[in-house]
């Protein structure tokens, strides 16, 4: 939607092995395909400009210590990277950034969000990622007072992600409608799975919840409730969840993995090293 997401497209490929090279490549004003090789140790947030594909080479490409900041830019793809030990967010999408695809990455042991999307960003897919050993996973909408920028935006799809013993925000949603959370595997989530707040509309569909006492609920902290529709979810040793209200129609066609098969499909397919890059 919104013209599709192609990243760097057919642009030439640059391989980066240092923090300086990574920062320069992702911050370029021209379209590029960037391959991250080995472990890059860095700090702070690196600005990612429009029309970039950022790919991890092999199974072990790692960005450690820093994060990627997509700030008002568009058409960015991030795939097959191990993010760890970030000191802010691993991936931050903000200021009306659009057409972003975050796919087949691992996130562990960072400070704040693994994938935080906020400030009017739109048309984003977060798919086939694994989050483990981490607290604040995926925030969608940063403030109860930001309705003016966020209402009508923050339309995000989360599918086939593996929330592996992570704590909270899978996602925590303000204002976005529809937000589509489907075919994810929640295993041993210690805080809560999905929270719909501040008049958001979230469809929680075909997910597999295991050992998760609070799979989804309305409101969170000081944030008032949103709407949440749940259908065709599969539960093993988990709570029932809280629903209410209605959600805008999903604007695209999609095929659901059979909910009882989601655990197998996602644990075999999510995270790095699964897509042959």
Question: Language-model features: where?
Answer:
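Acidic Gly/Asp/Thr-rich repetitive segments characteristic of extracellular carbohydrate-active
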Residues: 1-35
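Residue-level marker of regulatory loop/turn positions in helix-turn-helix DNA-binding domains and
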Residues: 70, 94, 118, 150, ...
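Structural detector of coil-to-beta-strand junctions
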Residues: 67, 90-92, 114, 137-139, ...
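Extracellular beta-strand-rich solenoid/capping regions of secreted or surface-exposed proteins
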Residues: 23-30, 38-55, 61-80, 84-97, ...
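Short aromatic-glycine motifs in intrinsically disordered, low-complexity regions
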Residues: 6-8, 41-46, 196
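Extracellular beta-rich repeat passengers
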Residues: 173-177, 182-186, 190-277
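Right-handed parallel beta-helix
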Residues: 51-57, 74-85, 97-111, 121-142, ...
């Amino acid at each position: 939607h919104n013209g599709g997401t192609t990243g760097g497209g057919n642009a030439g490929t640059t391989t980066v092995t240092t923090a300086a090279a990574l920062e320069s490549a992702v911050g370029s004003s021209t379209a590029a395909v960037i391959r991250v090789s080995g472990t890059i140790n860095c700090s702070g947030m690196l600005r990612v400009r429009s029309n970039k594909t950022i790919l991890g080479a092999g199974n072990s490409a790692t960005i450690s210590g820093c994060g990627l900041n997509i700030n008002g830019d568009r058409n960015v793809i991030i795939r097959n990277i191990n993010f760890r030990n970030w000191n802010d967010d691993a991936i931050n999408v903000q200021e009306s950034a659009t057409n972003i695809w975050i796919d087949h990455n691992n996130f562990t042991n960072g400070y704040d969000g693994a994938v935080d999307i906020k400030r009017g960003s739109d048309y984003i897919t977060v798919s086939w990622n694994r989050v483990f050993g981490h607290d604040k996973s995926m925030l969608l909408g940063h403030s109860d007072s930001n309705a003016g920028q966020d209402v009508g935006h923050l339309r995000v799809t989360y599918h086939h992600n593996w929330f592996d013993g992570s704590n909270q925000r899978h996602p925590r949603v303000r204002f976005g409608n529809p937000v589509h959370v489907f075919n994810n595997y929640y295993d041993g989530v210690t805080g809560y799975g999905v929270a719909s707040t501040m008049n958001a509309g979230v469809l929680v569909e075909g997910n597999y919840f295991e050992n998760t006492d609070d799979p989804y609920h309305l409101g969170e902290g000081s944030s008032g409730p949103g709407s949440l529709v749940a259908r065709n979810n599969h539960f093993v040793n988990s709570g029932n969840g809280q629903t209410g209200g209605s959600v805008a129609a999903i604007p695209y066609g999609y095929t659901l993995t059979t909910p009882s098969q989601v655990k197998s499909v996602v644990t075999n397919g999510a995270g790095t090293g699964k897509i042959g890059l």
